[in-house]
C-alpha cells in the first residue's frame, strides 16, 4: 500500500492535506510533516496544508488558505481522521482523488486509497515510515519535517509513556532526533502551561468523582471555563492528568461548549471505544471521544462506564 500511495502522490501537480478538527500534535505532525516532505521532494508541485489553526500549536506550522478552484484535479490527503464528519474543512471530497492515512479503527472507510495501521503509535509514525519507503523514489526529509513528525509521535505516545509506544516508535524517534532541531525547546513549547490552566487542573483534582468500581468523572461547565479564563480545548487537554490516581480504571471528562458537550474517555484497562461509538464517537481502545447534547446523556454515559469498569474486575 505504501508504494501505491507514493506512486499516486507522484502523479498529481496539486496536493491538499487535511486533518481532524480540534487538532492535537499528531494531527499537526502528520499533516504538516508530510506537507514538508512533499514540498522538499517536489518543489514544482503545489502543496497545501489546510484547516482551522489551533492557537496552542500554531508555533509548529503555518497553515494555508486555499480557494475552491484549487481543489479541481487535486489529490486530497486526510491524516489522522477516522470519521468524515471530523475532517477539518469539508471541501475534502472536492478533489480528483481522496487518500486516507490513519491509525484509528477503520469504521468509516472513506477515500479512494486507504492506509490504516491501528498498530502504529501515531499517524506521524506512519508518515515517517512512508518517507522511509519513499527514499527509494527520491523523497527528502528536512529538519522541519523531522521536528513535526517527532512532535506528533511525542504527543500521541504521551512522551513515550503510553502503551502504544513500541520498539519501532523509539527507533524512529531516535532517528528523527538526529536532525538539528531542539527537542528540549519543542517539549517546552508543547507542554508549557499557563497559570489559569494550572488552576483549572487544581479544580479538576478537587472535583473528580471516583466509584468503588474505578469509574471516575469530571464535569467542566461553561461557568467553570469562564471562571478560570480557559477554553474548552484547554480543558479537554487536561484529561490525562487523572491517569496517575490510584484506583481509577477508566474515566470521562465532560466539557461544556456553546452547542455541545465534549466527552473524553480514557482507560487503564477496560476497552472504551465501543462506549464512545454508542454515543456517536470513536477512537482508540484506551483513548476515545464523543459529543453529546444534554446532561441526561452524560448520566447515561456514567452508568455505562460504571458497568464497563465493574465487568473488568
UniProtKB/Swiss-Prot annotation:
Top-level EC class: hydrolase
Keywords carried by this UniProt record: Exonuclease, Hydrolase, Nuclease
Pfam families per record: DHH, DHHA1
Protein family (similarity comment): Belongs to the NrnA oligoribonuclease family.
Any further remark recorded for this protein: In accordance with its dual activities, is able to complement both orn and cysQ mutants in E.coli.
Function: Bifunctional enzyme which has both oligoribonuclease and pAp-phosphatase activities. Degrades RNA and DNA oligonucleotides with a length of 5 nucleotides and shorter, with a preference for 3-mers. Directionality is controversial; shown to degrade 5-mers and less in a 3' to 5' direction, and 11-mers in a 5' to 3' direction. Converts 3'(2')-phosphoadenosine 5'-phosphate (PAP) to AMP.
Complex formation: Tetramer.
Protein's name according to its UniProt entry: Bifunctional oligoribonuclease and PAP phosphatase NrnA
The gene coding this protein: nrnA
Amino acid at each position: 500500500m505504501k508504494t501505491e500511495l507514493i506512486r499516486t502522490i507522484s502523479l498529481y501537480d496539486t496536493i491538499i492535506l487535511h486533518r481532524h478538527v480540534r487538532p492535537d500534535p499528531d494531527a499537526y505532525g502528520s499533516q504538516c510533516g508530510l506537507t514538508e516532505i512533499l514540498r522538499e521532494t517536489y518543489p514544482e508541485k503545489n502543496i497545501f496544508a489546510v484547516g482551522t489553526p489551533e492557537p496552542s500549536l500554531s508555533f509548529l506550522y503555518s497553515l494555508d488558505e486555499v480557494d475552491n478552484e484549487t481543489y479541481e484535479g487535486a489529490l486530497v490527503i486526510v491524516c489522522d481522521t477516522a470519521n468524515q464528519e471530523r475532517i477539518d474543512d469539508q471541501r475534502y471530497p472536492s478533489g480528483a482523488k481522496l487518500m486516507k492515512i490513519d491509525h484509528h479503527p477503520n469504521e468509516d472507510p472513506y477515500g479512494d486509497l486507504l492506509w490504516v495501521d491501528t498498530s502504529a503509535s501515531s499517524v506521524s509514525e506512519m508518515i515517517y515510515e512512508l518517507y522511509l519507503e519513499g527514499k527509494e523514489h527520491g523523497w527528502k526529509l528536512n529538519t522541519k519535517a523531522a521536528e513535526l513528525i517527532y512532535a506528533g509521535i511525542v504527543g500521541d505516545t504521551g512522551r513515550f509513556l503510553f502503551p502504544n509506544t513500541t520498539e519501532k516508535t523509539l527507533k524512529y524517534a531516535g532517528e528523527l532526533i538526529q536532525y538539528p532541531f531542539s527537542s528540549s525547546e519543542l517539549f517546552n513549547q508543547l507542554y508549557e502551561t499557563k497559570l489559569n490552566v494550572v488552576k483549572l487542573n487544581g479544580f479538576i483534582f478537587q472535583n473528580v468523582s471516583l466509584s468503588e468500581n474505578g469509574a471516575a468523572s469530571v464535569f467542566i461547565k461553561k461557568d467553570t471555563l469562564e471562571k478560570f479564563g480557559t477554553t474548552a480545548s484547554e480543558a479537554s487537554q487536561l484529561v490525562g492528568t487523572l491517569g496517575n490516581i490510584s484506583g481509577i480504571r477508566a474515566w470521562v471528562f465532560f466539557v461544556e461548549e456553546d452547542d455541545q458537550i465534549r466527552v473524553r474517555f480514557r482507560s487503564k484497562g477496560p476497552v472504551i471505544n465501543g462506549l464512545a461509538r454508542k454515543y456517536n464517537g470513536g477512537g482508540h481502545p484506551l483513548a476515545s471521544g464523543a459529543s453529546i447534547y444534554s446532561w441526561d446523556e452524560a448520566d447515561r454515559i456514567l452508568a455505562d462506564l460504571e458497568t464497563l469498569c465493574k465487568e473488568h474486575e
